[in-house]
Amino acid sequence: MALPKAKWEETRVLRERSWGEINTITKDDFKTNYARNWMFKNTDPLYWRPPAGESIADVAENRVHNLLTSLNRKSDAESVVMVSHGDLMLALMLTLEDLSDEEFMHRAASDEWKITNCTCFHYSRRDPATGRTHKRFRWEQTARPVLDETDGRWVVKVDEWREFKRPVLSNGDLVDVVHAV
């Protein structure tokens, strides 16, 4: 990336989540040797933790929160580019958008939200329509490679800007959530 006047910093915080004991085994060995853990992987992708590894929730609560605190302290009002793996990107999305467990589960199960290789998320505090800057991130735009079926070439698909708002519950909303449990 030839970004003018860029200052790059390498950090272990952006590493892929730890896959623990299953890091070096095949998927078939995982299914055979960790059958119960394999079952949980598919039913609870947010809190599922590989044996001796990290869940996406662990990554969000520990590394992503620390990363955002550090960026706030060191990079105020600067543009920041981060390059990382998909699960850390999911943890970043979970944290920045303050997703509920239910919304995270919906996205994890949806092809529309799948993070493929070379997917880019662009978060912004600047309203793309008005240029007005807000205190917190409120917009996200995704770019991802897709295969053009007509000519077999890869192209970059850039989604429209999407505004997100952190959920705030009224008293009645909170009562409804409690009753739903």
Residue ranges and their predicted role:
Residues 76-87:
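Generic beta-sheet signal
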Residues 60, 64-72:
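Generic structural signal for well-ordered alpha-helical scaffold segments
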Residues 30, 59-60:
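Conserved anionic group-binding/transfer micro-motifs
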Residues 100-131:
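Domain-level recognition of soluble alpha/beta enzyme cores
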Residues 126, 132-181:
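Non-catalytic terminal regions with compositionally biased, polar/charged low complexity
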Residues 1-39, 109-119, 180:
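Phosphate-coordination/substrate-recognition cap region in phosphate-metabolizing enzymes
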Residues 1-3, 95-99:
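Active-site catalytic microenvironments for nucleophilic, acid-base chemistry
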Residues 37-58, 163-166:
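Short glycine/proline- and acidic residue-enriched helix-loop micro-motifs
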